Amino acid sequence: MNSKLRNSLLDTALALAASAVIILMGATIAAADDAKKYEAEFTADGKLVRPSGWREWVFVGSPLTPNSLNGGEAAFPEFHSVYIDPESWEHYKKTGEFREGTMFAKELTLVGDTAGTSGIGFFNGDLQGFEIAHKDTNRYSKETDGWAYYSFGHKPEPYDDAAAAMPTAACAACHTAAAAEDMVFTQYYPILEAAKAAGDDGAGIGGKK
């Protein structure tokens, strides 16, 4: 092999190796950025900053206790559409535990029409509020098992940009008394129960592509 060809092959190999390193570094940085994207942020006075993009998180359910089935005085008469941040979803699938930093987003919608083309029932109306449940055992009290709950307004959009943690009696006490697992009402969310430590099977991955 002449030196010119050898040098050309060496240059090509070095270029490919450099490209591989750049790609690997890029993937590592992207993964770190994705993880950071789902970290809670706080203002200087300790309020939780409303996360962005929650409607693209993993949807886990939408319970409803309408006024019409509760004597006109339901404690929570709206639809509660609940999402978990994607990083915590992946962790829960693998371990069956809610990681430090887990966030659940809950968006409220009023009950709208009670009749549709599919029949009589309950259909979503207007948006009516937004809340976050956040797990951080270093930040929050042992009394709430390291969780805190935030309301960004019981109102239509725009929601508040930041919120202070609600008093324990306002939300956490009910979770302490009745939630099935780690302050989370998993008993009402079959998607979470199916995902618990189930890997990709718990996400419905598999079967026909």
Locate each region found by the language model.
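Sequence context surrounding c-type heme c attachment/ligation sites in exported
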Residues: 33-35, 40-43, 50-58, 62, ...
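Sec/Tat signal peptide C-region and signal peptidase I cleavage site
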Residues: 27-32
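Short, structured beta-strand/loop micro-motifs enriched in basic residues and often containing a Trp
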Residues: 78-89
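Short N-terminal micro-motifs specific to bacterial/archaeal maturation
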Residues: 21-23, 48, 165
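N-terminal secretory signal peptides that target proteins for export/translocation
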Residues: 1-10
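Acidic, aliphatic-rich amphipathic alpha-helical segments
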Residues: 69-71
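Bacterial N-terminal signal peptides
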Residues: 12-26
